[in-house]
């Protein structure tokens, strides 16, 4: 199995937010016993959905749960810049298009209990790949081997991919950054996620200055669970 390494500086950053994401993971667990596959999206690019996905997966892995992090943003992956490998690794695109076996793209990491499937090469038609039987079969197979599967999706305010992915999940989380998206767009994104028929867990407010927030240290996930 190929191995990916997360940079030490990124690990240090994750550890600084450990308390917040441990609480977020606890809230996820309290929301239902059968919530295993969770999509994470945002309204716009740059709001922190990839960082949130990585931190949630890291927190579950640190708690002893066998966790898989899937980079579902095959259009414009941010995660490719976080996990590094000296080996040539295939990813989600190659598996869904039938050019590689999933076992070739399933990667171990330098974090115990955390595994990763990268996005792979850019596809000319990523939406069609996500709508394929291969994607549904992949999720159902991986459910058998992992306690939690976190999928980082493209921004739902930009493309429909996030809604397609969420239909195969158990629940979804919407990430928004302070001052990045207007209320109307956030409400529209929430509605799109709810229309998938899967549980909408709530909104994670990112890039919040907790020094001016009345919730203190809880500011980073103060909006979590508000539906």
Curated annotation (Swiss-Prot):
Name the NCBIfam families on file.
eps_fam (TIGR01007)
Q: In which pathway does it act?
A: Capsule biogenesis; capsule polysaccharide biosynthesis
Q: What's a GO cellular component annotated to this UniProt protein?
A: plasma membrane
Q: Name one GO molecular function term.
A: ATP binding
The reaction(s) annotated as catalysed by this protein in its Swiss-Prot or TrEMBL entry are:
L-tyrosyl-[protein] + ATP = O-phospho-L-tyrosyl-[protein] + ADP + H(+)
GO terms for biological process? capsule polysaccharide biosynthetic process
Q: Tell me the Pfam families matching this sequence.
A: AAA_31
Domain of life, per lineage: Bacteria
Q: What does this protein do?
A: Involved in the regulation of capsular polysaccharide biosynthesis. Autophosphorylation of CpsD attenuates its activity and reduces the level of encapsulation. May be part of a complex that directs the coordinated polymerization and export to the cell surface of the capsular polysaccharide.
Q: How is its activity regulated?
A: Dephosphorylated and activated by CpsB.
Coiled coil regions, renumbered to chain: none
Record PTM: Autophosphorylated.
Tell me its EC number(s), please. 2.7.10.2
The UniProt keywords, alphabetically, are: ATP-binding, Capsule biogenesis/degradation, Exopolysaccharide synthesis, Kinase, Nucleotide-binding, Phosphoprotein, Transferase, Tyrosine-protein kinase
This chain belongs to which protein, by name?
Answer: Tyrosine-protein kinase CpsD
Q: Which InterPro entries match?
A: AAA_dom, Bact_polysacc_biosynth/exp, P-loop_NTPase, Wzc-like_C
Instruction: List the lineage, top down.
Output: Bacteria, Bacillati, Bacillota, Bacilli, Lactobacillales
The text of the family note is: Belongs to the CpsD/CapB family.
């Amino acid at each position: 199995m190929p191995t990916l390494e997360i940079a030490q500086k990124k690990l240090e950053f994750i550890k600084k937010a450990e308390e917040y994401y441990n609480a977020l993971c606890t809230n996820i667990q309290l929301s239902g016993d059968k919530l295993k596959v969770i999509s994470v999206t945002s309204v716009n690019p740059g709001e922190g959905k990839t960082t949130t996905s990585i931190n949630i997966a890291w927190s579950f892995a640190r708690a002893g749960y066998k966790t898989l992090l899937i980079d579902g943003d095959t259009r414009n992956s941010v995660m490719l810049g976080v996990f590094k490998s000296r080996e040539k690794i295939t990813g989600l695109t190659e598996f869904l298009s039938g050019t590689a076996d999933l076992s070739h793209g399933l990667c171990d990491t330098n974090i115990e209990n955390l595994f990763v499937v990268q996005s792979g090469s850019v596809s000319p038609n990523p939406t069609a790949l996500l709508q394929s039987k291969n994607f549904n079969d992949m999720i159902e197979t991986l459910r058998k081997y992992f306690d939690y599967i976190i999928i980082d999706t493209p921004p739902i305010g930009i493309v429909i991919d996030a809604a397609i992915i969420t239909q195969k999940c158990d629940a979804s989380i919407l990430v928004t950054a302070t001052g990045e998206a207007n209320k109307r767009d956030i409400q529209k994104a929430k509605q799109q996620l709810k229309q998938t028929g899967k549980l909408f867990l709530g909104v994670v407010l990112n890039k919040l200055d907790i020094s001016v927030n009345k919730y203190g240290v809880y500011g980073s996930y103060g909006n979590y669970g508000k539906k």
